[in-house]
A protein has these predicted regions:
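Bacterial N-terminal signal peptides that target proteins for export
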Residues: 2-14
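Basic/polar N-terminal segments that are highly enriched at the extreme N-terminus
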Residues: 2-5, 24-31
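Bacterial N-terminal signal peptides
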Residues: 11-23
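Extracytoplasmic c-type cytochrome modules immediately beyond a signal peptide or single-pass transmembrane anchor
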Residues: 27-149, 165-198
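The canonical Cys-X-X-Cys-His
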Residues: 150-160
């Protein structure tokens, strides 16, 4: 049988197109919304801790407060834009009034505080909450992960602050209520709200 070059390549091209049209079996399965939330929480916490660590090394607690004021909202906004979720931080005793909790966040964090005050091992993962509710509007999905006070956090959130830090906090956050904490206590939470789906 004498086939032209284009006729011989047609079955090969057809086979390639067929392979491209198939779903990617054996690849990474798509993450669920709660798995994506956990990954985002890891990223938010990791990036913010890295920024705060650099600020503490370069300029101490006053520089760290400045980083929290400027960089934390920028990181959250970038993650919100890339994920489609509303990414942020909240606390019952907040430093920035823009981070004040809504009713659900407050209730979840009160539960976190009770959980953290029980005799859990120090190495346990921070408590988290996965909330999915259905209404006439559709399905609402929320994720919260506790931010637990660590010894390094005491410089900015402990009972005793350096005078220059106290001055900076009063200047930048006149309504601050985020001091007087001890290690192991609930400091706040990372919070994600995904778009309502039908």
């Amino acid at each position: 049988m004498n086939m032209t070059r284009s006729a011989r390549s047609a079955p090969i091209l057809f086979g390639l197109y067929a392979l491209l049209a198939l779903p990617a079996y054996g690849g990474e399965p798509e993450m669920t919304w709660d798995e994506r939330s956990r990954a985002l929480a890891d990223q938010l916490v990791s990036e913010l801790q890295a920024e705060l660590g650099r600020a503490m090394q370069q300029g101490g607690p006053v520089a760290a407060v400045a980083v929290c004021k400027s960089r934390a909202p920028e990181i959250a906004a970038r993650l919100s834009a890339s994920s489609g979720a509303d990414v942020g931080r909240t606390a019952i005793r907040w430093r920035n009034p823009a981070n004040a909790p809504d009713d659900l966040e407050r209730a979840v964090m009160q539960g976190f505080a009770v959980e953290l005050s029980s005799a859990l091992p120090a190495a346990a993962a921070p408590p988290e909450a996965i909330v999915e509710s259905r209404s006439a509007r559709g399905t609402e999905r929320r994720y919260l992960r506790a931010i637990v006070m660590q010894p390094v956090c005491l410089a900015c959130h402990g009972a005793t602050l350096a005078p220059e830090l106290a001055t900076a906090i009063v200047r930048d956050y006149p309504q601050d209520s985020a001091t007087g904490f001890e290690p192991g206590q609930l400091r706040g939470a990372v919070t994600f709200q995904w778009p309502v789906t039908r």
